[in-house]
Amino acid sequence: MHVLRNMVEAVKPYGHVLDLQVIRPNPTAELDGRVICEIDGEPLFHTADAATVAVDALVRAERLLEQTVDDHDVRKHYANGAELVADFADKRRQLPDGALPRLRAIAQPCVVRERCRLRRLQVR
């Protein structure tokens, strides 16, 4: 909340703040539009939920005015499954152990798809 409050105070009145957060459902690893596995998004959702509560509190306090909300898919593209698996090696979100052999065997481009919410907020 402290960082958010400092950010809002740094923006001139009627200036804009963009808030981008991951949202549920869980992200998925996909090949040719087919879901290979679901990725547990809870470690990231926990942080995102806390940020949402903080932004919503500023909206209720009329420090911010929510002007626009856009929920959309974000896809991260990988050359193959091994690259996807390597990208998750040091992340809080982990791929399911049971899906690792199948993912590593993918020799063609694949993606991770996740839902995101972009909110345009105006400082009051």
Locate the predicted segments by residue.
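A short glycine-/small-residue-rich loop at the edge of a beta-strand within enzyme catalytic domains
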Residues: 8, 42-46, 75
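Active-site capping/gating segments
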Residues: 41-69
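Long, contiguous hydrophobic alpha-helical segments, chiefly transmembrane helices and signal peptides
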Residues: 7, 17-19, 77-78, 88
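Conserved class I S-adenosyl-L-methionine
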Residues: 15-49
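A short glycine-rich, Lys/Arg-flanked "PGG" loop and its adjoining helix->strand segment in the class I
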Residues: 1-16
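Conserved Class I S-adenosyl-L-methionine
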Residues: 60-124
